[in-house]
Amino acid sequence: MKKKVLAVILTAVCTMGLMAGCGNSNVGNTNTQKNASSAEDGYKIGISQFAEHGSLDNCREGFLEGLKEEGIEEGKNLTVDYQNAQTDTGTASTIADSFVSAKEDLICAIATPCAQSAYNSAMNADIPVVYTAVSDPVAAKLANEDGSCVGNVTGSSDVLPVEEQLKMIRAMLPDAKKIGILYTTSETNSCSTVKEYQELAGKYDFEIVDTGINTSADIDMAATDLVSKVDCQIGRASCRERV
């Protein structure tokens, strides 16, 4: 019953769009962390975040603020276990497994790798998963083609308006020919967005030069190499916390 009540409240939170509040504030980098706030006789929620990044932090804060507005507040009737994967997909999977073992009432997953890990870990545990900051839930197999829920998971998308970005780049850089895109090869949403850029680039007389990276350790070298080949550069997916 408690999970059903929480699910209803979270539906209201999703409707208000509070989980999509992803901005661009800056934060410092820290080691993998676990912050737990305690509350007596209330809800337990595990929050898994893929990286230390302002926009992802805003998603987490917006999620908690939305719950607070619905009467579920950290330190009163809500216990939050926040863990950060520090851009490591293996760590994201371990975090998800730990939330299932802890029998959290719900898992909030921020960014695609955490969302996929949470869904895979919780699918047989009767623990609902709410995700945010997922650009392409369908490609990530977190939603059906019509946008409906897959299993016990729902959430919000931060899909980019690709064509509008191309229009803006053309207006700002009328002589530009090549756009560089740095993306994470292991993220389905990142790959699908690059494909969309490629499909639309010709319409605005652009050529897309893309470079895939496997880990955050590859970013600096890949970005330095890519910037020498293009007129402007776009950072995608997990690359955003460094580019």
Question: Where are these predicted regions, by residue range?
Answer:
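An alpha-beta-alpha
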Residues: 45, 63, 154-202
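Conserved small/polar residues in nucleotide/adenosyl-binding loops
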Residues: 237-243
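Extracytoplasmic "Venus flytrap"
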Residues: 44-70, 81-90, 186-190, 240
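Flexible loop/hinge segments that line or gate small-molecule binding clefts
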Residues: 117, 122-162
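Short, low-complexity disordered leader/linker segments with a strong preference
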Residues: 1-44, 69-73
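Short beta-strand scaffold positions
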Residues: 47, 108-109
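Short, well-structured alpha-helical segments in soluble
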Residues: 87-106, 117-120, 220-232
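Short beta-strand elements in bilobed, periplasmic/extracellular small-molecule ligand-binding domains
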Residues: 71-92, 152, 198-216
